[in-house]
Amino acid sequence: VQTVTEECVRLLDRVRRELELSEEQFEVVDYKECFCFYHCNQEEKLQNHQAGLFDGSSEKIVYYSLEKEKRTKPCVVTIKEQKLGILTDDKDAGFLAMAQQAFDKQLVSTVYFVGSAFDGGWMQESLKYICRGRRAFLGKNLYSLGACFVAFQKKETEREYVYLGDSEFKMNISLKVRKKQELEFYSLVTAGENWYLKEHSCEVILDGTDTVELWLQHPYGREAKIESLELADLPKRPVRTTRIRITVHLLGDTKADIEIEDLGFGELFPSSEKVWKYTMEF
């Protein structure tokens, strides 16, 4: 879709349920995210500097500027949107002015064109300017191909890059857990996930503590902040006999509700049915 909104996601989610598709088989992405995944899967020589996309799918020309923060791992990708206006009767001269405005003080090495506005072979002087030191590509299926890359690569546990747009969550949330005597991080939420209608949950056994520590890390940084959530009035039980469920409800790109539920430990220690709720804004 052109723009992801909560209303749009709710509507398409109803369609998903009607088609009996699982949440893993379903993803709503906007044009900018499709552009990101399409460009980032092109050959390396096109990745030197910024990439630009002129969208002529509607009456108004829109320009998307893609930039990578290569010092982070994974690489963080952001896209800025600029509305350039309507083409005049002299399309070539009008579009030349738009391109000069879009490229002002920017180092752009790759440019894409999509949409019927660029049909007809009218780009002459504007195209000469755009291709001066830049590679340019014209096509109609960039968004659909980008969506295919999204579907394929979001299944991967380790990614080379993460896209942070308006509808993507901006923080990594993890737990430090012990698994087979080894300490490791369990990812509850990964930065770059679409936050609409999303929740994540897991069950863990407490090891002699009445607090839950969430590790928060911004994708731009290396250091993590630890947020300690106290489980007030948690029933006293022997070590490792308290199982809890942690659920994260995403409320926005920087906001989440955390719900922690006491599950007890089977018939030996029944659940107290206590629930602790926290709201976190980053």
Question: Residues of each region from the PLM?
Answer:
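Short glycine-rich, Thr/Ser-proximal phosphate-binding strand/loop in the N-terminal lobe
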Residues: 63-93, 268-282
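A short acidic (Asp/Glu
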Residues: 7-12, 38-41, 61-66, 119-126
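Phosphate/ATP-binding catalytic cores across multiple sugar-kinase/actin-like superfamilies
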Residues: 35-42, 90-107
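Structural alpha-beta junctions
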Residues: 17-29, 105-108, 125-142, 147
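Glycine-rich phosphate-binding loops at beta-strand->alpha-helix junctions
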Residues: 1-7, 101-128, 139
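Nucleotide/phosphate-binding catalytic cleft detector across ATP-hydrolyzing
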Residues: 1-51, 180-250, 259-282
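A short acidic Gly-Thr/Ser loop motif
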Residues: 45-62, 67-68, 115-118, 164-170, ...
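Glycine-rich phosphate-binding/hydrolytic loop that grips phosphoryl groups
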Residues: 29-43, 136-178
